[in-house]
A protein has these predicted regions:
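Membrane-inserting effector segments that mediate pore formation, membrane fusion
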Residues: 116-210
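Terminal, membrane-proximal amphipathic helices
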Residues: 1-127, 151-164, 203-250
């Protein structure tokens, strides 16, 4: 990636990390108290960009940082099981510009936010990879992947300087196994041309994103090759499914 593009991606990531995404949980039920405690949310709506209004049936999400306000079904679960489902549903309702800030401020949201960032970038790169212009896709895809890696880093609370950003990209965006991924794709993808390129673009982005998430969850420990192979295999399966849906729309 050129220095100009690198600086642009770095600046965008810094700006995203500076947003505010304070979350409030309202309601008088024991369920509201439990959810607020699980999320680490405040109980007052004052200054909140995300508001979860709890009721017996579920929750209603609204606020400045919410792109898709409305009802969120509340699973009949407790503790971690409730948290895992609720965070995914909240994240899917959020404005993309506030995701990094939400994860940075509220650790329970980190996994769901980083998965959403990964999938968003993978979908974009799959569409770019399907364009019939050889070589024109690489600068855009590379910039998307760099942005994804740095946004995941910011979501985990990394204070990014330009030097730190370069270091992370060298460690996480390089050598994650694109050649191995391409070899696996030949065996698993039953179609060629633009569709195969789109699958590899999607899967490569997902594999990079998932390995980056694990890197930060494990305190800076890189994923081993055996585990990376499994990540690539699953990413290819997801990529194949996504591109199959694209092909049906064309």
């Amino acid at each position: 990636m050129g220095l100009r593009n690198m600086y642009k991606v770095f600046r965008e990531t810094r700006n995203a990390a500076r947003e505010q995404a304070t979350i409030a949980v309202t309601g008088d039920s024991p369920r509201a108290t439990e959810v607020a405690a699980l999320l680490g949310a405040q109980r007052s709506v004052r200054g909140a960009e995300v508001i979860l209004a709890m009721s017996e049936k579920g929750a209603t999400i609204s606020g400045k940082a919410v792109d898709d306000p409305g009802e969120i079904p509340l699973p009949d679960k407790y503790g971690k099981a409730l948290l895992d489902e609720l965070t995914v549903r909240v994240v899917r309702a959020m404005d993309e510009d506030y995701l990094v800030a939400l994860a940075k401020g509220y650790p329970p949201f980190r996994r769901a936010v980083c998965e959403e960032i990964t999938r968003n970038n993978a979908r974009q790169n799959a569409v770019i990879g399907a364009l019939p212009i050889p070589g024109a896709d690489m600068p855009v895809m590379t910039a998307n992947q760099a942005r994804m890696v740095l946004n995941i880093a910011a979501a985990f609370g990394e204070e990014l300087s330009m030097d730190r950003a370069k270091e992370l990209l060298a460690v996480l965006a390089g050598g994650f196994g694109l050649r191995a991924l391409s070899r696996q794709a030949v065996k698993l993808v039953p179609f060629g041309g633009w569709a195969a390129s789109a699958v590899i673009a999607y899967a490569g982005t997902v594999a990079m994103g998932r390995s980056t998430i694990l890197y930060f969850e494990r305190g800076g420990q890189r994923v081993g090759e055996k585990e990376m192979e499994e990540i690539r295999r699953r990413a290819l399966k997801e990529g194949k499914s996504f591109v199959s849906r694209l092909r049906r729309r064309r």
